[in-house]
Amino acid sequence: MYCSQAITQTSRLPVSNNFYCKKTFFSSVNSNYQNLSQMQSWSSLKVLAFGLPDLHSIPVNLNNSFQEAIVISTINDNNIFADVTNSWIKMHKDKNHYSLFYKEIFKALLTKQIHVIDSPIGSKDIDNKIILIQQYIWKKGLKSPQFNSIARLNKNVDISNISTKFIMEQLSTSPVFVVKNGLNEIILGHPLSRIRRTAFNQIASSLSNLFHQPIATSPISNGLFFFHPDDAIEFKNFVQSKAPEACKDMDIKIQPVGLHVAYKMNRNFSSDIQFRFVPDFKEVGDLIFRHQQAKNLHFHENQYYGKNFFQGQPIYMIQPIIIKHRNGRISIIKFTGANDDREVVFTNLEAANKSWANFIKRTPYLKRLKKPNLLVYNLESFLKDKEVLHKADLTKFIVVTNKSAYITTKESVTLPYHNGLSKHLELNVKPKLFFVKLWIRRLLFTLTYE
């Protein structure tokens, strides 16, 4: 394939030492495809192939404001770019030019700076010469928020929606785990490109957050919610191994939070932060390599899985049992919890089997069914399916996680919330006191340092 570029700019600027056969500045990026005869007649036409212009003579702030239109087309003798591309290759045999271009393209793809601005790739008839072409926009610098399209681009799930409010109520009794510091802040994972990003990108991100409009100027940072405490501990140990002094200084620890809190944060997006569920790794491994072929497991039709992979956090739902009595009467036995008729969603196969064993003790004619029929799905998709339901179709459910999660949660709650004051002290006052203590310690260290 050939790759050619047309740089767009609002004013004419001198460009020296560039790689172009001919050159011009189009007034708009939408000047996508020009008639072949017109292109050949324009002496100012600029077409680039396999190279980038040398823009060192242009001030940095102007250089960063560039955006390029990239046209990708198939190799064809009738291709309008073929001749100029071949001529450019012959003129510039230095492979550094070639590699530089693709290095920049690859970097832009990774940081999501290249976007399609035309319909999917198709044929274009230019002077009866059919070629396959597709145009993209390469954003090279600061991108300001488009204030007139905030509602269209806001990808947040409306937490005030009836279905999402209902879901949060059902998730409130289930624990997950995060790694926090003494300021009650979740530890985030940042890509290297974000740590090194420029002041312009920092400003763009801040503006995007202000107007709730996500922009893809760099890979997002991730906050993690763990279903099993052992996985959270492993992540904490990894962070401590990378920065032991900082972790000690910042009082890094794991802490249980309600699954409803994790769900709310997972379904809200900022410009560069996203919160993700981390499945129980042991549970996923056991399901894939030990239990996948079990006859009592039936996978949901929308579940994505294979011999060595499974999408999301596994959940198990005990399916109703059809019983035919001796008198010909048919009964449908639905599994329920001990105290109510809520649908029970298990994130652990062992918990599902034990609950079934307790259930059949209360139903003697089911004792011959040693194992329940289980529908296997993933929690993320299960919740998304619930989000689109109408109020009349919503049914109560409860998520039962692994035994270790409840034990760890019980051990972690050292300050019982008997009243609103205790909760306020734990969540608001304690982090502020830690902040003061931290900076006093740092100030004393600075004053005593020789």
Curated annotation (Swiss-Prot):
Q: Which domain of life is it from?
A: Eukaryota
List where in the cell it is found. Answer: Plastid, Chloroplast
Instruction: Specify whether Protease is a keyword of the entry.
Output: no
Which biological process annotations from GO are given for this protein?
A: protein transport
Write out the entry's keywords from A to Z.
Answer: Chloroplast, Plastid
Keyword Plastid set for record = yes
Example GO CC term: the record gives:
chloroplast
InterPro entries documented for this protein: Tic22-like
Q: Which family does it belong to?
A: Belongs to the ycf80 family.
Task: Report the protein name in the record.
Answer: Uncharacterized protein ycf80
Organism in which the protein naturally occurs: Porphyra purpurea (Red seaweed)
Query: Lineage in the entry?
Result: Eukaryota, Rhodophyta, Bangiophyceae, Bangiales, Bangiaceae
Gene name in the database record: ycf80
